[in-house]
Amino acid sequence: MNNLHFIKWVFSNRNYTDIIYRLISLFLGYPLLLLSYLIPRSKRKWVLGYKVGFTDNVKYLYRYLYKYEKTVIPIWISSNKSEILLLREKGINAYYRWSLYGLYHCLTSYYYIFSSHLSDINYWTSGGCFAVNLWHGVGIKKIEFATTVGIDSKIYVKNIFNRILFPYLFRKPDLFLSTSVFM
């Protein structure tokens, strides 16, 4: 897909609010990403998150860390404010990704634990972190950059526009858990 077709596809498949939000996050995000490389990080502090909520492997690792690893401070980061309120009622240390506390914890935590991409937590604060992708299932089909049909075949294309608009797709984790070396 050439760049002009990609731009047309973006405008036809997103509402204008999403496009404006994406542009604002890009203009503010890139300077924040550069700043995040300069801030010291604590190896005791781990931020965890998943774009679909407090679920899957990340949830269970959070619960394990909270219960058994007293040298680790697990912090749940979410983009859903109502989810944060529910988690806090259950005693879970949870923050909104763009709140001052959320940004502070993201900028000062060394470990980022997520299920899909760094954007599950906050890509823009991840400079200098150790990224761990727990993934959310066992692959039985082609995904992401291996796809040739559907919406992913348009997003997961290595071109300059995608690298600028979706930089989190191109950041490889430092550790990726898998069921075998063949995955």
Place the predicted regions along the sequence by residue.
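Membrane-proximal basic amphipathic "stem/tether" segments
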Residues: M1-Y50, V157
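Active-site and donor-binding regions of nucleotide-sugar-utilizing enzymes
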Residues: K45-M183
